[in-house]
UniProtKB/Swiss-Prot annotation:
InterPro entries: UppP. The gene is uppP1. Its main location: membrane. It comes from Chromobacterium violaceum (strain ATCC 12472 / DSM 30191 / JCM 1249 / CCUG 213 / NBRC 12614 / NCIMB 9131 / NCTC 9757 / MK). The keyword Membrane applies. This is Undecaprenyl-diphosphatase 1. It is a multi-pass membrane protein. GO terms for cellular component: plasma membrane. It is found in: Cell inner membrane. GO terms for molecular function: undecaprenyl-diphosphatase activity.
Amino acid sequence: MLFHSLIMGLVEGITEFLPISSTGHLILTGDLLGFLDKEKRDVYEIFIQLGAMLAVVWEYRRKIGHTVAGAVRPGGERNLLLGIVIAFIPAAVAGLLFSKQIKAVLFNPVCVAIAFIVGGLIILWAEKREHKVAVETVDDLSLKDALKVGLCQCLALIPGTSRSGATIIGGLFLGLSRKAATEFSFFLGIPTLGAASLYSLIKHRDALSADDIGVFAVGFIASFVFAFLAIRALLRFISTHSFAVFAWYRIAFGLIVLGTWWSGLVNWSA
């Protein structure tokens, strides 16, 4: 069980901030491993999401500290913090209204695979468009564009879409540089993952057990470490590459899942 927890934490850490859908990978990996029952897995995912979120906080601790200090100081710069808050609201509202229905209908391997493929095609389309940069850094992002990125994040309620993918590609469409779109996606992930984890923790508090501390701790640590590494690797990668490689990965992986499901080669649950 601890080894499976390590694998799940690794998957969350690597995929949370890449445009390839952490939720989709967790659904597929959890089903393949037969990892925990549904309620226990929901609780477990709270802890690995927190691990990934804290990796962003640690990587950008100086930037976050500077941003918060500027926001509370009289006459200080509040634009970035306000932008994050405004961008967070649409997905928070949509999640409260529709997450239960979406989970009941779409949280299965086939729907995830289809979303993988569709998302990959959208990324390829976005990369083929002429990309005119109007916003070089996250500090230059207008509140109007922040809201638009937040609306894009609502698409991530569909498993397999990717929260990072929706916000980064949405940012590119709005004229953000690759670095600005990626970093704003990172920052937006802090309240999004934090709120989702808190909501799930309250909802599933009765499923918490001291017997699971070891399993949860392994997943949390693995998620933190690999998310930290993935964040740094992605920032280096996008300085010289497009997101097309992630698109082709999504398409190929989605086709493999559909093929193994259709052929019966892999007995996907759900």
